[in-house]
Regions:
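Single conserved hydrophobic/aromatic residue that forms the stacking wall/gate
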Residues: 1-8, 12
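Active-site cores of enzymes that catalyze phosphoryl transfer or operate on phosphate-rich substrates
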Residues: 77-220, 269-287
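Short secondary-structure boundary/capping segments
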Residues: 46, 53-63, 148-151, 232-234, ...
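Conserved short loop/turn motifs at secondary-structure junctions
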Residues: 13-18, 45-48, 216-222, 234
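Extended, regular secondary-structure scaffolds
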Residues: 18, 34-118
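Extended, well-ordered alpha-helical scaffold/bundle regions in very large, multi-domain proteins
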Residues: 228, 232-286
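Glycine-rich phosphate/pyrophosphate-binding loops
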Residues: 29-54, 242-262
């Protein structure tokens, strides 16, 4: 026989963050499942999550918490739903025979966002929603050509780009590299999640103007707010809707909860970093 208590105690606790923001997100997911609302929670599958605390001579020491070292039985990898997320490069503008402007991102770096589903079980109602957390994988992987030429850093550049995105929650942003990584993390899971949601919608519906009647994106504090501009980018550039139609859809299917007015929670990004990492998204923000 299976002792559920014993089995559960053998599973290493996933350390994907804590605090009020994470607690509220967990409450949202628990309530949605218990009330029978179909919903996905979206985030990043951090390889180390929060740090593991050790005490030495009365002082705290933070060490990596490798919660995935023995695998995690309650997650399901879904490679069939992977999406490309692009960073950097430049935007090329062109005009078609009808005088319509088109925008294409060129010379970018990209990673593949691969979702892992975790079950969120409602209370006594046979409802199971999903926590969909995204892992980053290289699009091209190891470059044997660069390695054979002695350029070892370039050989693993794509692998490192992907790995760095999902290493830890809240990387130190007291320096430029840290700020860049945080912005990349936020855009990474937002872009992948919106691409997935729109793909699900289009599988069953043909008119994107009906999206606000079928779905809502709940932004939990400021960290995922680039979702507004990313949804506009996809609707305008990839689905070829007019700006006004895209804006009407976006304003009716995106919601936001603000948790605090503390300065560290109300994020600001240097224009140089935002424009360099997300050139097309920056254009939309400017517009």
């Amino acid at each position: 026989t299976l002792d559920r208590s014993s089995a559960a105690s053998d599973v290493y606790k996933r350390q994907l963050g804590n605090g009020g923001l994470g607690r509220l997100a967990a409450c949202f997911m628990d309530s949605l499942a218990t009330l029978g609302y179909p919903a996905y929670g979206c985030g990043i599958r951090y390889r180390y999550g929060m740090f593991k605390q050790q005490i030495s001579d009365g002082f705290q020491i933070e060490v990596p918490d490798n919660w995935l070292k023995d695998g995690y039985p309650f997650e399901l990898r879904r490679p069939e739903y992977c999406y490309e997320v692009k960073f950097g490069g430049y935007v090329q503008e062109s005009t078609d025979e009808n005088g319509e402007l088109h925008f294409e991102q060129k010379d970018y770096q990209s990673v593949l966002a691969v979702p892992y589903d975790m079950p969120i079980v409602g209370y006594d109602n046979n409802v199971v929603n999903s926590l969909m957390i995204w892992d980053a994988e290289p699009k091209n992987g190891f470059s044997l050509e660069s390695f054979d030429q002695g350029d070892y850093d370039k050989a693993v550049e794509q692998e490192n780009l992907a790995r760095n995105l999902v290493e830890v929650l809240y990387p130190n942003d007291n320096h430029v590299k840290g700020k860049e990584l945080r912005l990349k993390q936020q855009y990474f899971f937002v872009s992948a999640s919106i691409q997935r949601a729109l793909a699900r919608f289009k599988k069953h519906h043909s008119d994107l103007k009906d999206l606000p009647n079928k779905a809502v994106f709940q932004m939990n504090d400021t960290h995922p707010t680039v979702a507004v501009a990313e949804l506009m980018r996809i609707l305008v550039d990839e689905e070829h809707l007019s700006w006004d139609d895209a804006w009407d859809i976006t304003t009716r299917c995106v919601a936001y909860t603000n948790h605090t007015i503390m300065a560290e929670a109300l994020e600001k990004w240097p224009i140089e970093i935002f424009q360099r990492l997300l050139p097309r998204v920056y254009q939309i923000v400017e517009e």
